[in-house]
Structure formats: structure tokens, C-alpha cells
Amino acid sequence: MTARRILVTSALPYANGQIHIGHLVEYIQTDIWVRFQRMMGNEVYYVGADDTHGTPVMLRAEKEGITPKQLIDRVWTEHKRDFDSFLVSFDNYYSTDAEENRELCEKIYLALKADDLIAEREVEQFYDPVKNMFLPDRFIKGECPKCGAKDQYGDSCEVCGTTYVPTDLKNPYSVVSGATPVRKSSTHFFFKLSDPRCETFLREWVADLAQPEAANKMQEWLGSEGEASTLSDWDISRDAPYFGFEIPGAPGKYFYVWLDAPIGYYASFKNLAEKKGIDFDAWVGPHSTAEQYHFIGKDILYFHTLFWPAMLRFSGYRTPTNVFAHGFLTVDGAKMSKSRGTFITAQSYIDTGMNPEWLRYYFAAKLNASMEDLDLNLDDFIARVNSDLIGKYVNIASRAAGFLVKRFEGKVDEAALAHPLLKQLREAAPQVAQLYEAREYSKALRLVMELTDTVNAFVDTEKPWELAKDEAKRSALHAACSVSLEAFRLLTVYLKPVVPTVAAGVERFLNVEPLDWRAIDKQLSASSPVQAYQHLMTRVDAKQVDALLAANRESLQATAPAAGAAAAASIEPIADTITIDDFAKIDLRVAKIVECQKVEGSSKLLQLTLDLGEGRTRNVFSGIQSAYTPEQLVGKLTVVVANLAPRKMKFGVSEGMVLAASAADEKANPGLYILEPHSGAVPGMRIG
């Protein structure tokens, strides 16, 4: 069979912070798939890079008193260290602040411009008169134009969920300097995604997406065929000062970070190609027969399934074969939290003495091909790793290897290796391979653990420790140990993409060549004696997990005594007096949260399905994702403004407002708290 040629990427981590376990979901998912493809004999290149450009990097470097280049170089070293620690096997890990990336950005931009897909338009933005810079959405705060909530970002309100443009904010201020921004016009460059050519191409391209959720979301963005396109042109430029690449022929204008970041995939591969003599154009040209896959989080699906393929298609490059999106990580059913210690950094995990392959295995046991979220339940983590990897898998080798080495010089009984058990294990290979290929890791490991149970049942039946007591049963002991270790070798082939370091240890003590998928059709040989058994993995100790949480838990003790005073200081002044008639216009009702889910493309909103006792349910968007997971809210009672006029939002129509409490200065006193009526209240009850 002809080997496949595959280019694989993971999303680029931003060069403004540490790698944490939420990031690692994606890199471990990708790495398992890449390692499996290598074991299958395919030509695979896995490339990545740090995403280095943009205002946040520029401002952080300024705050630290260093240059942006010094900052991104330091962060690159930290990120590379963390990926190496978790056995993420990049063929090349690079930076978007590289000459290859500059050249590719300019080439793609000029090709799009030549094809009349770049437009220039005047844009009015907020400008910081102190810092002399235009302000991105996240660097402006003010009062929500809809509900009046203070300290809301420039793109949406976390209290009521309304989305808006920054210039809609009331009493805006610059997060950078605190100054009141002024409105200022500037010429910006847009990629014309609304061009009919882009729409036609994207409708064809979406048909090949593997994930139904991704295809459905694309259809939402594209709208029904024959209707007016819902696609909007994309602002690809930013004004100086900006850390990034200047746009050719446009002094003081820079490529927006989201343009040069995905192009960074190609820049990293080009850097690798130049070092290894790979024909770059043969892999990424429009007629390439290679495959190209992007593993990403579902929050950046929009960029990778609309802008990125359209940019490639109309600038003379091949388009992705597929995009694979995964869900978000929760810990013990809740968002990662610094106060609880569950915002776990990669480095703290390693520093605590935790084995990276424990986490690789646990994530693999939870991952599938969908975009659903996954939860790291710490008690389950301890139990599953200790049960599956230690109690079941490693236990096989520890029960058989010693006898084979001591009694038989490590030489297997080759005649015994015709045992039906081994045939059963080999017959599972196509199914295991199919599940790895489809990214259904949880199903693959479930099957492997079922096979492991079968092997352990064989060992329990044969009882080599009993056979060893009777010299007359020497041949039976030899056969039992030989079959057990050959079974262990086959199981190791199946687990190698997930636990490569353990697999390397197995290869050493079994005295075999590095295991790939073809090794399934081979077997242990008496001419290559098994070596003395070396311990492969230790059990997870609950005390280690406690220490990990403690290492990541922010100390609240120092701030606790002043918490009350701080909260009091942040209380907003009481609003102007209203009459009872004014209040009577507001219809507050008890509502039951029937369903709840995160809103695709929003880091703030939750979509709630509410029962107000009307005989139907209502759809309400609420900006409380920072405080609650969907699982925490389903089944709860809350309070809703029931007679608020429905409003059309970016993500749908909201038919009410969930009431929540927060401090006036959420930065100083973070936290959102939905209102809950006492037990006994039922949906539909009026509050007054």
C-alpha cells in the first residue's frame, strides 16, 4: 500500500502566557494521531509555532520593560519545554515572527489583491490620546449601551449578553492608560469574504468536513443556498504602533494577527522543508496530493473554516483536507479556577512529579471525534490510571517476565506462540487502527482494555506463580510466560501512540526493534532473549494530586480580611428614584433552567432554555459563562425579566434577561451570581 503524505498542525499558542492543561488537550489529541500515522508507515510532518504578534504582546513587553522580541523568545523556550515534557512530537516548532512567515503573508496578500479580493475602507475607531494608538475591542471598557452594566469590554456585555461595536459603549475608557478615548478614522484593508466566488467555494468545501457539528455551523454562517450570503468582509489590518508585519505598500499598516497566525503553519513547514530538503510546493501547491489537517479548539472554528480556506484557495495554495475541532476542558465539572487550584499549568504538573503519560492516557480515554467538552475528574483520573495502566496493562509484564528470565534465560517458547489468545489480539488490529484514524480514542482504549482483561484472565487461569513451584510443570510455565509476554507486546503496539515512553521501555526489556503497526504480524523470538524486567510506571498517589492543586491555588488568605471592605467600596451608587408605576412595568418571574449550553464562538455567553410555566420554553442568552458551567445550572430556578422585548443577537434571539449580581468593579471584585428563589417557588411565579 502506498504511504500517505500528511501535513498536520495544532493551533498556535499565544506568546503571552503559560501552557496549561486546557491547551494540552489539543496537543495530546494531535500527537496521538500523528504517532499513529507514523506507526502506519505514512510520511507525516507535524508542525507548530508560537503565535507572536498583536497588541497584547506589545503591551506586555512594554510593561516588563523588554522588547517584544525578547518576550516572545523567552515564551517560545517555555512553550517548547512544556511540549517536550508532555511528549508532543513536533517535527518543527517555530515562530510566526519569522522571515518565512513575512514572505508568505506578503505573497498571499498580494495574490488576493491582484484577484480583486482586497478592499480599502475608512473605519472609525477609538483612539487612546495618551498612548497614541488605536484600541482593540478588548482594550476598551465602558458601560453597556443596553443594560448599563459598568466595566464591559468593547465587543459584548458579560451581564446581559448584548453584542455591539466599541463606539456604542457609554463612558468608554482605555484599559491601557485609563484615558477617555477619542473617535478617529483610519483606512483599513478587508479580505472580501462576501465575494460570490468565496461563497461558492465555501459551499463546496464544507461538504467535505468530517465533523457534523462543524458542517452545521458552517451552514449557519453561509445561510441557505439561494438566499443572500451572511458572510462579512474581514478586516485584516491594524494601525501602528503594532507588533507584526507591515503591509506592503501601506506604511503604518500591519497585518492583523489572525491573518499571519494560520499562515504560520506554512511558515513552520517551509522552515522544516528547507532544512530537510522537502519540496514545499509539492505539499502546499494547488495540485498537491498530500493531505493537510488542522486540529483546533471549537472556539476558533470560524477562522479555520471560513477565512483560512478561502485565503488559500484564492492565493494559489491547496486547501485543508479537513479541520478537526475539539471541545473545552473542565476540571471536576467546572471551569478551571485559580482559586481552586484547577487552573493547572504544564510546568507545575511536571514540577510536582506527575507522569505526563498519566494525563495523556486519561485525555485519550475521554477524547472522541466530536466537539463535545471533556472533564478531568481528578478522582476518576487517579482510579482510571491506576486501574487501567498499572493494575491491568503493566501488571501482565510484571507477572510473567521474571519467571521467563530466571528459569529460561529470557528465551520464549516459540511453539507456544500459536495460542488462540494471540490470534484474538491480532484480529483486533484493524478495528483499533480504524478508531485511531477516526480520532475515536476513547473507543480505541476501551477495546484495548477489554483485550487486556482477556489477557489477565489467561494469566489468572494459568497461574504461572503456581506452575513455578512444580518442576514437572516447567514446560507449562514456559508456555504461559511466553504467551503472556507476546500478548503484552501486542497490547503495547496498540497503546504506543498514547504512552510512547512506556512503549520505549517495553521495547528495551523485550529486546525488540521499535514497534510499529507491522509488528503485529511479527512475534517474540528465542534468538532475542527478553531482558530483566524494569519498572515501567508508578501508581498515581492522591497526595500528588493534592500537591498539584496546592501549587496552582492562588492564596486568598492575604486578601480575605480586606474582601468585605473592597466589595463595599465597589458598590455602585443607588440609581435615581422611580415610582411604583415604573417598577410595575417590570415583570419578574421564576424560571427553571431546563437546558443550558455554551454558545459557539463566544467565551462569555451561555444559551439557556427556560420554563416560565407558559406551556412553552424560552431561549435566553446570558453573559455568565465565566461563572458557571452548563452542568451547574441545569435544573436550577432563577429570576428572569419576562416582559423584556426580544432582541436579535449575533447568535440568535434572546427572549428575556436572567438576573445576576456583580460588583461595580469586576476587575477588583470578580464574580457573577445568578439570583435563585427559595425552595417552594415554581416556574411562572411573579416576583414583586
Curated annotation (Swiss-Prot):
Subcellular location as annotated: Cytoplasm
Ranges where the tRNA-binding domain occurs: 582-688
EC nos: 6.1.1.10
Binding site for ATP: 338
GO molecular function, one term: ATP binding
Catalytic activity from the UniProt record: tRNA(Met) + L-methionine + ATP = L-methionyl-tRNA(Met) + AMP + diphosphate
Function: Is required not only for elongation of protein synthesis but also for the initiation of all mRNA translation through initiator tRNA(fMet) aminoacylation.
Subunit details: Homodimer.
The name this protein goes by in its record: Methionine--tRNA ligase
UniProt organism field: Cupriavidus pinatubonensis (strain JMP 134 / LMG 1197) (Cupriavidus necator (strain JMP 134))
